[in-house]
Amino acid sequence: MSAPAPVVVTGLGIVAPNGTGTEEYWAATLAGKSGIDVIQRFDPHGYPVRVGGEVLAFDAAAHLPGRLLPQTDRMTQHALVAAEWALADAGLEPEKQDEYGLGVLTAAGAGGFEFGQREMQKLWGTGPERVSAYQSFAWFYAVNTGQISIRHGMRGHSSVFVTEQAGGLDAAAHAARLLRKGTLNTALTGGCEASLCPWGLVAQIPSGFLSEATDPHDAYLPFDARAAGYVPGEGGAMLVAERADSARERDAATVYGRIAGHASTFDARPGTGRPTGPARAIRLALEEARVAPEDVDVVYADAAGVPALDRAEAEALAEVFGPGAVPVTAPKTMTGRLYAGGAALDVATALLSIRDCVVPPTVGTGAPAPGLGIDLVLHQPRELRVDTALVVARGMGGFNSALVVRRHG
């Protein structure tokens, strides 16, 4: 069987707690600069979780038309700006393309929590006549896909994936499939989240997975014996994907890499005795990419920061690759877990690793907990030629996804 038409990534747009814009984020990440701190956009002291990864340097009014500001939640503002930056990076002008060949495929784990909280407070505080008409869509988990497609006149196949942290991988993979089939010529794909408001935080706390540490430096320690949960964050990334022949024909300035393989699985119900965790998704993604385990240069881990989940992920990696056989990193220790935005940001970061032949560090974690058997890139970047990177993401409730990106050409 012939190999499928390669799909490449030609544009990146990043909005993250430790940097807005691709190069600012990448420089901060390589320097080990964290965007995790005590939450500042509201007073968190009445809550058990007080630390988060906020995008404090982001000013939506500096990037978006004034008419969009009152109708969009913060997560949508992040997504709109990241999409615009990705298109500019790719050198693509949507208005000059076939509008039905342009699609938007995003991931979402929640919706417009901050916008929704504000309007609910109006409803119960001053009456329904004060509630914004924009509430009808600003809260909706699919709104980022809609707003991006409207803003850029992208009328082709569009969708949204709601698989929590795994969603960014699932959206990118589906975009690649549509491009290979010829359903789309160009796709904007990725995810952005922004649920760091009182209502959003309270909705997350019952999971029991959030860190209650008050020191930002010790709050998120995946694979460490001291791990006690993850730090919630906001932001994400958008990517421009297209077929390699299309990128070549238009003489794209940059090809970051290609989307080579993907798989998703779902954990069995507890008590069935069937295996859980991401090992099967990893194997299937490698199979689709036609990559042997020994050819993977780095793994971008899900890194839940929850001891049982960390151990399950480490065991899955050891099962597929062998103990300590492949470098593993978790730069999300500098941003917090961004839910649907997190996996998209990991894909962008993996592509930057391929471009610059360097693996960013995991910060905070002192050393892997005894018995995990992983080669964790700690404290400093590791110079390494990266031709193949694997990104792993797990969503709450049993979602497992894995995506392989490779150097192109």
From Swiss-Prot:
Signal listed as a keyword: no
Family matches, as InterPro entries: Beta-ketoacyl_synthase, Ketoacyl_synth_C, Ketoacyl_synth_N, PKS_Beta-ketoAc_synthase_dom, Thiolase-like
Keyword set includes Transferase: yes
Catalytic activity: 10 malonyl-CoA + 8 H(+) = tetracenomycin F2 + 10 CO2 + 10 CoA + 2 H2O
Gene Ontology molecular function: 3-oxoacyl-[acyl-carrier-protein] synthase activity
EC number: 2.3.1.235
Residues annotated as signal peptide: none
CDD domains: CLF
All residue ranges annotated as the Ketosynthase family 3 (KS3) domain in the record: 4-407
Top EC group: transferase
UniProtKB keywords: Acyltransferase, Antibiotic biosynthesis, Transferase
Pathway: Antibiotic biosynthesis; tetracenomycin C biosynthesis
Similarity comment: family membership: Belongs to the thiolase-like superfamily. Beta-ketoacyl-ACP synthases family.
Subunit structure, as described in the record: The tetracenomycin polyketide synthase (TCM PKS) is composed of a ketosynthase complex (TcmKL), an acyl carrier protein (TcmM), a cyclase (TcmN) and a probable second cyclase (TcmJ). TcmK and TcmL form a heterodimeric complex.
Stated role: Involved in the biosynthesis of tetracenomycin C (TCM C). Part of a type II polyketide synthase (PKS) that catalyzes the synthesis of tetracenomycin F2 (TCM F2), a precursor of TCM C, from malonyl-CoA. TcmK and TcmL form a heterodimeric alpha-beta complex that catalyzes the condensation reactions between the growing acyl-enzyme chain and the malonyl-CoA extender units.
Note: This putative ketoacyl synthase lacks the active site cysteine.
Name of the protein described by the UniProt record: Tetracenomycin polyketide synthase ketoacyl synthase beta subunit
Organism: Streptomyces glaucescens
Gene: tcmL
